[in-house]
Amino acid sequence: MSEINSIANGTYTIGQTSATNFVAGHGIKIDEPSAGTVRIANDETVLYDSSALISMDKALGTTFNISEPVTNFEKFKVYYTRFPWTDQCPTHQIQEFDATVPVNVIVLHTSFATSTATNTSWYYCAETITDVSGTTWKLNSCSQMQLPNGNIDSSHIYLKPYKVIGINRISGGNE
């Protein structure tokens, strides 16, 4: 017979009633979604999820809201895609950031290649997001650089975040 004991808010032990209990380690979430069912998973919280990507051609100055500050977590992941889409670029990408480092700006980036009959070019794109210590994030600037000639075209490409996930809650929110 197994049992689950709550030994503190958000901390559980699992084990046999007469055997050694095993404690869920930091970053592991154990819950009981229904009677007699135990779910063990990573401690992740969805802070923003939009299947409708920001539809503007130009994202500069656009804001979006997350449900709570990422500083309530050890890390956070941003899922994003390039807009407009092309066959040469990865469609969806993920970057993970350390939320314990006090920053207010993050940079999403991607690189991709295009090819024509006479030329193959590598592109690098970077998008800055400001105010990430709060709950209203702003898409601030985006630039594209064509390598190797270094031409910059800031009106051509945008990176669109569509999901933000907090990992391993450390404080605040709905613990």
How should each PLM-predicted stretch be described?
Residues M1-V23, T37-G61, I165-E175:
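Glycine-rich, low-complexity segments
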Residues A24-E32:
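Extracellular disulfide-bonded cysteine-rich modules/repeats
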Residues G36, L60-T62, V103, D131-K138:
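Ser/Thr- and Asn-enriched, surface-exposed coil loops between beta-strands
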Residues A52-F73, F83-V103:
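Surface-exposed ligand/attachment interfaces on beta-rich extracellular proteins
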Residues F76-V78:
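Hydrophobic/aromatic beta-strand segments within beta-rich folds
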Residues Y80-P84, I94-E96, K160-I167:
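Extended low-complexity, serine/threonine- and proline-enriched intrinsically disordered segments
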Residues T91-T128:
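An exposed tryptophan-centered "aromatic clamp" motif
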Residues T114-E175:
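Extracellular jelly-roll beta-sandwich "head" domains, especially the C-terminal globular C1q domain
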